[in-house]
Regions:
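Long, low-complexity, mixed-charge
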Residues: 1-103
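A generic "cationic amphipathic patch" detector
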Residues: 3-25, 199, 260, 282, ...
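Short, structured coil/loop segments at alpha-helix boundaries
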Residues: 4, 8, 28, 32-36, ...
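Residue-level detector of solvent-exposed, low-hydrophobicity positions
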Residues: 22-24, 53, 60, 69, ...
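Conserved beta-strand/loop scaffold segments within soluble protein domains that form the structured core
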Residues: 75-354, 358-361, 382, 388-404
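Extended amphipathic alpha-helical segments enriched in small hydrophobics
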Residues: 355-377
């Protein structure tokens, strides 16, 4: 049997030995069926399922669905893996779910037609409903959210998706911990185009963030996604891309890790159709005692001849105590394909600091300019001034701490 296996088709056993797989990615931590069971038993304190339809005039209509029947009729497609946290230390699964957690369940669907230019702010928690359900009485909160974006044929959309909400601040101060499970699925129909910036949640409370992004590319579809990670206590991110014939996927991102935060990123790119192109480029800065692992796999499946894939990570280390793990992998089952991968890491360039100081900048300001130069190309893609200013202020706040 071993003789029949090709080395570049085998998953590497060293992956486990390197201890970079901190999370299990085989199943969800809590399934939709379990949520439905809790609703039936009146043990789920809050559910909010919304369908949001956006037409080519950029008007948005909301329909709130709260019945069990509607939830059962709108089950999420589970053909792809979601990140789960199976190592959460609980003694009894059912008892922990029922007694220790207050559940918030949201589901949104955006359908894109024509030309769209829109900023989306997800209303995870409605304050009025929060008070009615006495969520503040619970020690812990489990928030599970589904966002399904459907780009119809020949549509051309630009979206800014901000997953931060001020409403969370009213809850965090009164609760011990939070588990946030965010699942985003983007379905690209044939000849559709999506340009998107995603600002992932930022806070400093004790908690865990599970973030899943799934891209299903149609024929001749094109998507460009910029991801912004500004730091959470424990953050686990996975993106799965399926590329069909002549699908183009361009993913770039920035991250900042600090304090004793953990960031785990997993990029899984699958070329299925012919002549697809995928590009991944990530820039990051690490300070303090933070931890980061970045894993990237590009797989060229049978039948994807003419496809190209590339993945790169560039890291600036500003602390000797920060720990980084990087593992890029290429797997090939087809001929006539091109694949490249790489990673680089380094410290602050003293020559650049000297040059900027010779132009009148202080050392602290010179460091800030160099760091922000890695982030600005992505931040400048945010068209909403309020969101952009918030992102810049958060990043600069953490950078200033390193200068003090």
């Amino acid at each position: 049997m071993i003789r029949n296996l090709k080395l570049n088709e085998m998953r590497l056993k060293t992956w486990q030995h390197l201890n970079v797989n901190e999370v299990n990615i085989e199943e969800e931590y809590i399934t939709e069926e379990e949520i439905i069971d809790l609703i039936k038993e009146n043990k789920c304190k809050y559910t909010n399922v919304k369908k949001i339809y956006t037409n080519n005039e950029s008007n948005t209509s909301f329909k709130t669905i709260n019945t069990l029947k509607d939830i059962e009729l709108n089950n999420i497609n589970k053909e792809y893996n979601l990140i789960s946290l199976n190592n959460l230390k609980t003694t009894n699964k059912q008892n922990t779910y029922i007694t220790d957690y207050s559940y918030i369940y949201n589901k949104y669907t955006y359908e894109l037609n024509g030309i769209i230019n829109k900023t989306i702010k997800i209303d995870e928690i409605d304050i009025q409903n929060k008070k009615q359900n006495n969520i503040d009485n619970y020690n812990n909160i489990y928030i599970k959210e589904y966002l399904n974006i459907i780009a119809n044929e020949n549509s051309n959309s630009y979206l800014v998706l901000d997953l931060n909400k001020n409403n969370y601040k009213n809850i965090n101060d009164n609760n011990k911990s939070k588990i946030e499970d965010i699942n985003i699925q983007i379905d690209l129909k044939d000849n559709s185009k999506v340009d998107m910036v995603i600002i992932f949640p930022y806070d400093k409370i004790e908690g865990i963030s599970l973030e899943n992004l799934h891209i299903n590319g149609g024929k001749k579809s094109d998507i460009h996604i910029s991801c912004i990670f500004m730091g959470r206590k424990q953050e686990y991110f996975k993106i799965t891309s399926l590329l069909n014939e002549e699908t183009n996927v361009n993913i770039d991102g920035i991250y900042l890790t600090y304090a004793n935060n953990t960031l785990d990123m997993y990029f899984d790119t699958n070329h299925i159709g012919k002549n697809g192109k995928s590009y991944i480029n990530i820039n990051g800065v690490m300070i303090d005692d933070s931890r980061k692992s970045w894993k990237g796999i590009i797989t060229f499946h049978n039948g994807c001849s003419g496809s190209e894939g590339e993945e790169n990570e560039n890291l600036l280390m500003l602390s000797e105590n920060a720990k980084s793990k990087t593992l890029p992998i290429l797997l090939c089952r087809e001929i006539d394909v091109k694949g490249n991968h790489g990673s680089s890491s380094g410290n602050m360039d003293n020559q650049k600091i000297f040059y900027l100081m010779s132009r009148g900048h202080s050392k602290e300001n010179a460091r800030k300019i160099i760091i922000m130069s890695r982030f600005n190309p992505i931040i400048d893609r945010i068209t909403n001034d309020e969101i952009k200013e918030n992102v810049i202020s958060i990043i600069e706040e953490e950078i200033n701490k390193t200068n003090n």
